[in-house]
């Protein structure tokens, strides 16, 4: 049977085909229009915006941390140096999961939990492309282990950064201080742009006081990097500005000598140029090695320092407060002249004690049998307590307080070191405010000989002595002598005023002569010398109170219950170049403290001019980088002196800070 097939409708098929073509062409045109509009959006209307965003993905600004300024002594001896260390770093832009990377790096870089916590704290506030230190001061073993698995951590780099090094170890620790890693509290207060790429900041001492000068200004380098943070091109840079170099008023040789005197002892020595207020030496013993703190002290070392009964971290010279004992008698005597209560001829008969009218309690002199007929000159020479009991009773605590504050007691000196203590010059208002009780007249008597609640720092005693040497002119103590660098800074060396004194200049001369006689024939006669004249005053401060009627029995006391020995003085007496304050904790009496001051005077006035102590050559006017020396290759601070007198600072002396109980003074048979 024959099949029949319908004929094709050619026209209809053409229409269908043509429609499909038009649809396809239209679809292509629409797609092209979408692409063209998107292209116009990106490349024409928002070109600048997206071009910048694109560049940010491949062009980065890397901070260039500034080199920290060096610190020198007055003669150019290098006290604080910079040294390169290897540091592991990363940025948030380089890794997908920061926590995972850090966890994987812990066994490789031997990260402690403290390292991890510090890194996480810093990375939180860092910019996305800012590189943050994971660990400072990597060892060769750390670097070798990381090199083997480096391919697993494309965003982690080993970089060279500068860190701090103190070539003289514990010798200047309490003055210079140290730098340490920036902590959470500091992160909130610093200018993050100014500290970009920086891990260290001044913590105590000069490093903290002059952080703004020492730190410098960071620079930046523009680089092109790929997705793995590998640098492809260096596009340009702005160099950092290094911090200012600081030249301190301290003298290396004098610091060595002063430190030697306190080796194995607890105490402090402060030496000042009374003409300018420049601090020539400042020693607190025992001391510590500041290098332990720079890249992070471990728990064991810190616990050893913190829990040490001798408190090596405690700056006795600036923070330590002690009863000043008889060292303040020259200043107090000048107050008697100021108020017209006594003159140089005023004399008393000293039976060895004093009692207030209507009170049977005896305030005893240190010399049980008394000093006989005593005028002001003899009272200073023999350190007659009874004379000052009578003077204080006539002067009264209010006038005493007003007068003694002019010498700086009970207030900060304004020294350019942090954490200075005010000490305390007690008065009725203070007692009512703090103890809710009235002032007793017997307390005035105790204060008159530097006991009771009266406390002062060694720095305050040195300043009061400098004011006495200056005939009342006041200078501000300071350790900064000069700076060199991009940041201007003016150091003041001129006297900033004079105390209000109603007497004459001749009165100051007579006081100087009395203090000279203290050394020639009085309680300080153990340090007299024909080579120059010293004007001084000894002092003894009770640590353990003694009941009325009881004798001071040294044999019955422990070593830490023995009296403190103090000494203040200046020399040459007629044209003072140096004023000194010494506190020897539990040193028994002021004569012992004077023995510690004598070598300091000798070095400054004699030895320094002929045979000054200098450290090894590579520690003068340069850095470890210049000398090509690693910290481990340096001798310790104790081995660096090249002259024979006084070889070192103390490394582990003994000391706590016992305070004298504020009670009525009792008999003390020890010669002050």
UniProtKB/Swiss-Prot annotation:
Disruption phenotype: Viable under standard laboratory conditions. Spherical cell shape with increased maximal cell width. Binds one Zn(2+) ion per subunit. GO terms for biological process: cell wall organization; peptidoglycan biosynthetic process; proteolysis; regulation of cell shape. The active site is at 326 (acyl-ester intermediate). GO terms for molecular function: penicillin binding; peptidoglycan L,D-transpeptidase activity; serine-type D-Ala-D-Ala carboxypeptidase activity; zinc ion binding. It is an enzyme of class 3 (hydrolase). The keyword NAD does not apply. Its cofactor is Zn(2+). GO terms for cellular component: plasma membrane. It is found in: Cell inner membrane. Belongs to the transpeptidase family. MrdA subfamily. Catalyzes cross-linking of the peptidoglycan cell wall. Involved in the determination of the rod shape of the cell. This is Peptidoglycan D,D-transpeptidase MrdA. The lineage of its organism: Bacteria, Pseudomonadati, Pseudomonadota, Gammaproteobacteria, Moraxellales. The gene is mrdA.
């Amino acid at each position: 049977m024959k099949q029949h097939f319908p004929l094709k409708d050619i026209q209809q098929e053409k229409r269908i085909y043509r429609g499909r073509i038009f649809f396809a062409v239209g679809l292509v045109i629409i797609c092209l229009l979408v692409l063209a509009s998107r292209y116009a959006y990106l490349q024409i209307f928002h070109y600048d915006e997206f071009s910048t965003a694109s560049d940010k993905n491949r062009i980065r600004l890397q901070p260039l941390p500034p080199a920290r300024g060096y610190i020198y002594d007055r003669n150019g001896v290098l006290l604080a140096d910079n040294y390169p260390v290897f540091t592991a770093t990363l940025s948030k832009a380089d890794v997908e999961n920061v926590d995972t990377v850090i966890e994987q790096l812990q066994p490789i870089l031997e990260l402690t939990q403290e390292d991890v916590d510090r890194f996480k704290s810093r990375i939180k506030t860092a910019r996305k492309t800012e590189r943050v230190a994971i660990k400072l001061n990597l060892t060769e073993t750390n670097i070798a282990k990381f090199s083997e698995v480096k391919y697993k951590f494309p965003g982690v780099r080993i970089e060279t950064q500068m860190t701090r090094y103190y070539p003289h170890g514990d010798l200047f620790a309490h003055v210079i201080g140290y730098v340490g890693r920036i902590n959470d509290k500091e992160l909130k207060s610093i200018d993050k742009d100014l500290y970009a790429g920086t891990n260290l900041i001044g913590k105590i001492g000069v490093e903290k006081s002059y952080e703004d000068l020492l730190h410098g200004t960071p620079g930046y380098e523009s680089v092109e990097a790929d997705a793995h943070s590998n640098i492809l091109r260096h596009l340009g840079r702005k160099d950092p500005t290094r911090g200012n170099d600081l030249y301190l008023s301290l003298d290396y040789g004098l610091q060595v000598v002063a430190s030697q005197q306190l080796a194995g002892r607890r105490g402090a020595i402060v030496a000042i140029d009374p003409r300018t207020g420049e601090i020539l030496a400042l020693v607190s013993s025992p001391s510590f090695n500041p290098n332990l703190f720079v890249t992070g002290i471990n728990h064991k070392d810190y616990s050893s320092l913190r829990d040490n009964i001798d408190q090596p971290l405690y700056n006795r010279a600036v923070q330590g407060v002690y009863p000043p004992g008889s060292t303040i008698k020259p200043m107090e005597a000048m107050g008697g002249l100021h108020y017209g209560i006594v003159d140089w001829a005023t004399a008393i008969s000293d039976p060895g004690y004093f009692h207030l009218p209507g009170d049977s309690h005896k305030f005893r002199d240190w010399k049980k049998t008394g000093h006989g007929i005593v005028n002001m000159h003899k009272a200073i020479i023999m350190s007659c307590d009874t004379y000052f009991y009578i003077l204080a009773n006539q002067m009264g605590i209010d006038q005493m307080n007003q007068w003694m504050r002019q010498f700086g007691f009970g207030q900060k000196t304004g020294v350019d070191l942090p954490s200075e203590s005010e000490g305390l010059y007690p008065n009725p208002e203070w007692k009512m405010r703090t103890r809710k009780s009235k002032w007793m007249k017997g307390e005035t008597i105790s204060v008159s000989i530097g006991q009771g609640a009266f406390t002062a720092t060694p720095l305050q005693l040195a300043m009061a002595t400098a004011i006495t040497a200056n005939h009342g002119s006041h200078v501000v103590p300071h350790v900064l002598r000069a700076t060199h660098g991009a940041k201007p800074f003016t150091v003041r060396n001129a006297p900033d005023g004079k105390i209000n004194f109603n007497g004459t200049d001749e009165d100051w001369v007579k006081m100087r002569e009395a203090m000279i006689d203290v050394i020639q024939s009085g309680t300080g006669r153990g340090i007299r010398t024909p080579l120059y004249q010293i004007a001084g005053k000894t002092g003894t401060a009770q640590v353990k109170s003694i009941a009325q009627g009881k004798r001071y029995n040294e044999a019955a006391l422990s070593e830490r219950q023995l009296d403190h020995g103090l000494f203040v003085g200046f020399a040459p007496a007629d044209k003072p170049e140096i004023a000194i304050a010494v506190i020897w904790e539990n040193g028994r009496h002021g004569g012992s403290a004077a023995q510690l001051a004598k070598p300091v005077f000798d070095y400054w006035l004699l030895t320094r001019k002929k045979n000054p102590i200098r450290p090894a050559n590579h520690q003068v006017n340069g850095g470890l980088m210049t000398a090509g020396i690693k910290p481990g290759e340096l001798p310790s601070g104790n081995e660096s002196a090249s002259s024979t007198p006084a070889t070192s600072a103390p490394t582990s002396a003994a000391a706590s800070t016992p305070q004298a109980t504020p009670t009525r003074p009792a008999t003390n048979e020890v010669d002050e």
